[in-house]
Amino acid sequence: MFLSVVVPVYNVERYVGDCLCSLLNQPESLCEIIVVNDGTKDNSMEIVHKLVNGYTNVRIINQENKGLSEARNAGLRHALGEYVWFVDSDDTILENAVEYLHDIVDTYPCDVYASNLLIKNEKTNEQYLEFAEFFSGYLPTEQYGEKYNGTTSQRYIFRKKFLIDNNLFFMPGV
């Protein structure tokens, strides 16, 4: 399995359908989708179950509410993919995104990949590209720190072994 996409779910009935639809349109042979039910109290999981019915590449993990970080960590622990992508339930990904990532990984093998984000303001419907300068290949750490300040996890695709071997998990309670 190339990629595990971890989607934490907690009271996101307004968004989770769009998120899952964008993920379910990716090739089943390349990715698994791990939905982590973090004890949601709304109808999010009913929406999830309805959408994922019949898909063999979707797994659902149920846990009591422990917060976003612990939900992501649970997904990481269950991930079967060589790479892991943490996608929040109010995010959508572009069509062919997983195939594109697969091609990039084949061309430029490394432990962490960073991507652009298209941010949409819900109130104004304005959109802007964060991380607008595109690069491909390798970027030394010191140059990355000078140019980019990207702290959102959905921007990064990680080699699972890199995270596990270095004991890199999300900090509980954050």
PLM feature spans:
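Short, well-formed alpha-helical segments that are part of the catalytic scaffolds
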Residues: 12-25, 47
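Conserved donor NDP-sugar-binding/catalytic core segment of glycosyltransferases
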Residues: 98-127
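Glycine-rich, basic loop-to-helix element that forms the pyrophosphate-binding segment
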Residues: 63-79
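Acidic donor-binding/catalytic loop of UDP-sugar-dependent glycosyltransferases
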Residues: 43, 91-104
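Conserved nucleotide-sugar donor-binding catalytic segment
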Residues: 141-174
